[in-house]
């Protein structure tokens, strides 16, 4: 989400690194606190006979930038430098640089109250249907590989999934005696959840088939999208984003492990515990979701209610899962492993509200230089600076 940074130094701002951050929207009190937080704040007062800078007018500038960031989601960056305080008390922006997004996301615009509440209710219902799916179709299901990996279908079956499981692969008649289907339209019912495990270039066509056959709840396990940082991966992600939006699809992923729900024996990796408990996890990283879940169970004997790995966050993001788990009766503690956040202000507001009912524990990656590189290569997220998180 939009953030506002304030600091002194003109062309030396980056070298001095004397800055304060806030997530928009700001109020006047927050803006004035920003001004007072920088180490060189004494320079803004009666320093060596200079007239003090008018803090109210300076706060006006910060408030204006805050509003601009919220009202114009197509703006990626505004750099006002230098901002000069004149002897008469005026604040003058001498130069400014505005960088626009080529394709602004519709999620950046503020939704109306009723529309937002309706969307949240629909997403909660969809996520509950996914977590408690009575039927799952695995597109790209395969027989166990020579190295022993069972694939998405095998992991679900071996874990003892309690619903109806449909392998979809036009090249197979069956998988270990279970009938395989050539496509989604040949299934005997509309599955509550479709797991897509095919090469990235094929995912868009599978999503089109999902939309055409009424399958709305999707988990894309496949990788090879924007997390690669390559032009083709970015293009493929934009394509599936368009297809998902046009089809009204609710997508977890791509590049993720999806749901782990011990109660329902739902699992997309191998060797997990069936022990249930009060902890739920929201994780961008599938590997960390797996390791964290196994660690808590194996070392501390703490069971899980739900674990959700969501990768590149195509249509559903951390705030959607947080809103869902806040109302989930099986979840008593919410843990989050975050690499990037689309709407930081919404996340903060949610956490403050939910903490009154159940604790929310956040593990934030990408705060160091090496961590930021790892995050970028993994999910393609913008990790965000350490000061913003503080």
Residue ranges and their predicted role:
Residues 1-390:
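Catalytic-core regions of core metabolic enzymes
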